[in-house]
Amino acid sequence: MINKYYNLGKNILFPINRSITGKGIIKTLKIFKKIHPKLKIKYFKSGKKVFDWIIPSEWNVKNAYVLDQEGKKIIDFKKNNLHLMGYSIPVNKKVSKKELLDKLFSSQKVKNAIPYVTSYYKKNWGFCVSKNHKNEINKKYKKDERFKILIDSNFKKNGNMPIGEYVIQGESKQEILISTYVCHPSMANNELSGPLLSMMLIDYFKKYKLNKTLRFIFVPETIGSIAYIHQNEKKMKNIIAAFNLTCVGDQRSFSCMLSKSENAPSDHALISTFKKLKIKFKKFHFTKRGSDERQF
């Protein structure tokens, strides 16, 4: 089973340009549905208000690159989809070297890595490169050189935001929620590891007759879980424990973030399991970090 999902992630899912909306996340959920046909794909309309949030317009991108004066591509979205800042607006113009450098995002901590940057709720554009790459551009080109910017993206105001849901019905109405998010592009640990682990858990638990109902959801981070809660407030009352699976694919020690009270059934189940299996782990307070744990 592990090899099956490892190969799925590496060869099929990793190259897909995912975001909180758009063709990439829909394609990913449809791949999951082929494996588990009972998985339901549900859609939330762009512009819909969920609590005090608004579902954003659907974003898609065909191409994006930067050309130097000689017509050479120095940044190419098609070589690595992390090069384009997520939700970049359409751009087709020439800019100065200073303007270009101001629009290049890089990481000071890991100088050979391309950072993941988004601008979901503010109109903006930009490219992401390693710090080393940015330094090379700054060193190679003269102050007065100009660069061609192309971002072939579009926004659909009448678009959709998809989520995936898979329920394994138990004998009890009480539920355990397992959430993960599917909105990141080519990043293995954050976040293909969570969805792939959820798929493996579905494979495992669907073979058994369960006491509690298991509800798996695959959502865009933050806005997806908020929209899901907004639509399913009554169902959420049946949930007695919830887990959010994220960044479970690296070689560091296990870590967990407990509930606000640190006294929920999920807290006791998690801590006791770690101790029983003699697994070393780090514990984080609810206010210190988190992704969709904040919502649930």
Where are these regions (language model features)?
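N-terminal hydrophobic/helix-forming segments and targeting peptides
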Residues: M1-Q295
